[in-house]
Amino acid sequence: MENVLQGRPALLLVDFQQGFEEKEYYGGERNNPQAEQNAQKLLAYWRANELPFFHIQYSSVSPKSPLFPEKAGYAFKEELKPLPGEPVLVRSVNSAFINTDLQAQLDAQGINTVVVIGLSTEHCVSTTTRMAGNLGYYTFVISDATAAFNKTGVNGERFDAELVHQVTLSTLQDEFATVLTTQQLLQQLRVPVAGS
């Protein structure tokens, strides 16, 4: 079944944190350098139209991680930082649904559709998307507002970030979510939304 935008979709901004600038820690090169710019467009649309959104923040338990709470990298990227009063959900695992009240907040507002963007495609974006799909939400991932990093396989083979990104998205498409670009999503949002 193809997902359709329903009601008031919630935007989940996953881990747009400064620590991801330390690319070597995450495997080296990253794809989609325009991901943050596209995320800004989407956040601006959600703010302007008073649609629900949540800033999701990763709090690493490892002092070595750039996302450890006492490091500068824990902070949100300047261009995507929450404004006063905007909801921020903090957790220490990959899924935005674990050890947060995200599901309760979505359900309390009658939200059945989520749009996932953020870092990184292969970890927290993928895990959050899979769980959203399993929980029964109509789920969308925005391919050019997410990004992946180079990876080393179990056999030592190196996989570049774009390949990691595309393979991850292909495992999500149709099974857990519908994958769209920023432009495709905005085009759909600018027509009457089903159920509104």
Residue ranges of model-derived segments:
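Short acidic, Gly/Ser-rich segments with clustered Asp/Glu that frequently serve as metal-coordination loops
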Residues: 17-23
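Short glycine-enriched, charge-decorated loop/helix-capping segments at active-site entrances
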Residues: 25-32, 64-67, 156-158
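N-terminal nucleotide-binding beta1-loop-alpha1 segment
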Residues: 11-16
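Active-site-adjacent betaalpha module
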Residues: 1-10, 37-41, 48-49, 66-196
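Active-site loop signature of alpha/beta-hydrolase-fold enzymes
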Residues: 19, 61, 148
